[in-house]
Amino acid sequence: MTKGDWEAVIGLEVHAQVSSKTKLFSSSSTEFGAEHNTQVSLVDAAMPGTLPILNYYSIEQAIRTGLALSAEINKSSYFDRKNYFYPDLPQGYQITQFFEPIVKNGRIFINNNKKEVRIARIHLEQDAGKSIHEESKTYVDLNRAGVALMEIVSEPDLRSSEEAAEFMKKLRQILRYIGSCDGDMEKGSLRCDANVSVRPKGSSTFGTRCEIKNLNSICYIMQAIDYEIQRQIEILESGEKISQDTLLFDVSLGKTKVMRNKEDASDYRYFPEPDLLPVEISQDKIDSIRSSLPELPDQKKLRYIRELSINKYDADVITSDKAIANYFEELIKKHDSKLAVTWLTVELFGRLNKAGIDIVSSPIKANALSELLDFIVDGTISARLGKQVFDIMFETGKPASLIIKEQDLKQITDKGQISEIIDKIINDNQDKVQEYQNGKTKLYGFFVGEVMKLTKGKASPDVVNFILSEKLSS
């Protein structure tokens, strides 16, 4: 069999950190980057006699996420203990939701909304701490222990690393739009485990799956899945069997490595958490959260295409990130959508990309660009001068009004003044006027250039064209 005779079957378990200032069962801060073990309560450290107190904000964010993914909200859910030993898990168990998750049966569309990927469940659970390894010692940092995670579990509907990457991008986009997770993979706010197996094309039987743990970038997700697919194909084609293992992806080697044999649910001895009551959610609460959801990216994109006549590519770019969409929305409060698209996606993005920064860090905020567009639209400056002003704004952070005043860039629109300048140019270049009138029409650009030279680019192009064409044809 060749590689084309095999089909990959992939499911993702995504761990999304809830955008909450406190942990799931304690009031400890979740701020990133604090000194080791400075954000640890007695509950987080599992001191005997301490009891968990549920953070209901995390419950609301899980419901919010479920509704954004068109899922069912379980009106009665509860927490369970997942029993295992690990140095950075001080309780000796993790509080999670195994039997009755808060959300089930959702979906995400990928491949231009042509493919549905089913979401089996979303449940809340505690994050573990972090082990820090040095040469002969291992340190444990419990700052992360107890942080609220949403585990978003897909069905095995993905068939390639590209689809897995698109699923992650789409999920991250939705989470950022609704504000339930910041989606920052570099800080570990969003990471995933990939369950990968292969089977002969056309088969409906699942192969033996391996789980690749803790993938924290889109690039690594694709590399790890591609390597694992090829590894499993080679094993099967050599006549051997796949071992159901838990794997780690070695970034430096670009290979997966066995971490341990994969456990089954029975190995964790799940049982209901005795220190927490069931979570009861009313329909009124669900409806209230639903009504607070913002316009989601697919809805926004469709509106831009249908109502604002923006092409699909630009609509995709603008809605790809909530911050970009918000910036654009600010611009179109006062300006034509096509003008806003050009200045956002061409002028601003060009400068941001060159500087290596994103729109959140842009030195030019939406209201500042909107003011610049005001001056272009009302004729105070030309579009050409507008780009010059924009460059200075980007470098200095100064408002357009101040730059125009300081640089004396206000456009000359006085017809009498421009007419006098054109008369002088015509009188000084009679030979070229004769050539133009004899059919050498390309010389028109020469006359425009001379006007701009004498006015330092400040003459209104519309006024120049109107007067110049009239004088050259007479």
From Swiss-Prot:
It catalyses: L-glutamyl-tRNA(Gln) + L-glutamine + ATP + H2O = L-glutaminyl-tRNA(Gln) + L-glutamate + ADP + phosphate + H(+); L-aspartyl-tRNA(Asn) + L-glutamine + ATP + H2O = L-asparaginyl-tRNA(Asn) + L-glutamate + ADP + phosphate + 2 H(+). Keywords: ATP-binding, Ligase, Nucleotide-binding, Protein biosynthesis. It is an enzyme of class 6 (ligase). InterPro entries: Asn/Gln-tRNA_amidoTrfase_suB/E, Asn/Gln-tRNA_Trfase_suB/E_cat, Asn/Gln_amidotransferase, Asn/Gln_tRNA_amidoTrase-B-like, GatB, GatB_C_1, GatB_Yqey_C_2, Gln-tRNA_amidoTrfase_suB_CS. One of its GO terms (biological process) is translation. Its EC number is 6.3.5.-. PROSITE patterns: GATB (PS01234). SUPFAM superfamilies: GatB/YqeY motif, Glutamine synthetase/guanido kinase. SMART domains: GatB_Yqey. Pfam families: GatB_N, GatB_Yqey. One of its GO terms (molecular function) is asparaginyl-tRNA synthase (glutamine-hydrolyzing) activity. Heterotrimer of A, B and C subunits. PANTHER family: GLUTAMYL-TRNA GLN AMIDOTRANSFERASE SUBUNIT B MITOCHONDRIAL AND PROKARYOTIC PET112-RELATED, GLUTAMYL-TRNA(GLN) AMIDOTRANSFERASE SUBUNIT B, MITOCHONDRIAL. Belongs to the GatB/GatE family. GatB subfamily. Allows the formation of correctly charged Asn-tRNA(Asn) or Gln-tRNA(Gln) through the transamidation of misacylated Asp-tRNA(Asn) or Glu-tRNA(Gln) in organisms which lack either or both of asparaginyl-tRNA or glutaminyl-tRNA synthetases. The reaction takes place in the presence of glutamine and ATP through an activated phospho-Asp-tRNA(Asn) or phospho-Glu-tRNA(Gln). HAMAP family: GatB. This is Aspartyl/glutamyl-tRNA(Asn/Gln) amidotransferase subunit B. It comes from Wolbachia sp. subsp. Brugia malayi (strain TRS). The lineage of its organism: Bacteria, Pseudomonadati, Pseudomonadota, Alphaproteobacteria, Rickettsiales. The gene is gatB.
